[in-house]
Amino acid sequence: MIPRFVAFLRRQPRWILIAIGLLWVAALAALDYVAPLELSFLTFYVAPVLFLVWFVGPAAGFLGAAVCAAFWVWEDVLSAHAHPMLKLQVTDWNLAIRAMFLALFVWVVAELKRALERERHLAQERLEHDVQIAEEVQTRLFPRRDPEIRGLDCHGLCRPAHGVAGDYYDFLPLEPGRTGIAVGDVAGKGLPAALLMASLQGSLRSLVTLSKNGPASLAADLNTQLHSLTESNRFATFFWAVFDEQPRSLTWVNAGHNAPMLLRMSGAVERLGPSGPPLGAIPRVAYRQATTTLSPGDVLVIFTDGVTEAVDVSDQEFGEGRLEQILRGNGSESAGALCDRIVSAVRAFEAGAPQNDDITLVVARAR
């Protein structure tokens, strides 16, 4: 509640904040005037002055202190008329002390605010530097060029929403004639998701040479390893497929990931749906794998939810229907051209709305 109220105040125009501070001072002066002489309101005047310094600036704080002094002079003059025995010299001395106290208070608070802002600025610079380094490192983790696969034209891309991505894609050469295609989406955003993504990639690359029993066995091993390394609320959806050039077969496993679309030359669109929960969600899972054959002209599109859940300014989602429509209308294009067309369509749909999630695509076109 308090952070929201502070954020609300920071959004207000300066003149409104100054008016609030000065009205606050006036209200205290009125209470001070009607209160008995033995009651001191000095500590209460600190609050509106602090408000002005913190939300507007030192000049506004000094203005508030000057207005306080003006009210004190006015009150002392009225008190002198009401109490002729009151010594004005003592009153003037008290006024000077109070004014000096408020002026010193304004200066101390202003310096404290400057120090905090400098520290926050330095911390922001350090964070941006770390994010830049992480982004450069992550860029090297993604494939630098499209794989050369006989009978398959492949292209992948990732457009992070916030500097570093929690999405992942990769092309891994296996034994001769076989290639692995991976797409993952780590829950969350920013650096924590990027770190888990790097862990997923490292685990995949180390396990892919050990799992000889197919994609389902690899997914089970990945799930066990990821669950042991992360908290229960950290998980990743994952799609892993192995393309065998000789029989032109695609053997795949889907761990809670968005169902990829497979456009056949006949015009039919098949969905390669989930065959188990996301990686890391539960400790031991027996995943199921499936195999299909790719004929020349078939197009496989693997995507993350940053594509289908992109929203426009009216908060309407791009949706899988639009993606399927683009796939049907442009299935004859190369893998790279189709990737670019999908991303361009998503950005045009958003129409200036901020990108809220990473956009990752892999297109594989049989030839």
Positions of PLM-derived features:
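Short, Lys/Arg-rich, polar N-terminal cytosolic tail immediately upstream
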Residues: M1-R11
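Membrane-helix interface segments
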Residues: P13-W15, P58-L63, G214
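Hydrophobic transmembrane alpha-helices
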Residues: I20-P36, V49-V90
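Transmembrane alpha-helical core residues of multi-pass small-molecule transporters
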Residues: V67-F71, W93, I97, Q201
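Cytochrome P450 core scaffold surrounding the K-helix E-X-X-R motif
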Residues: L262-M265, V311-E317
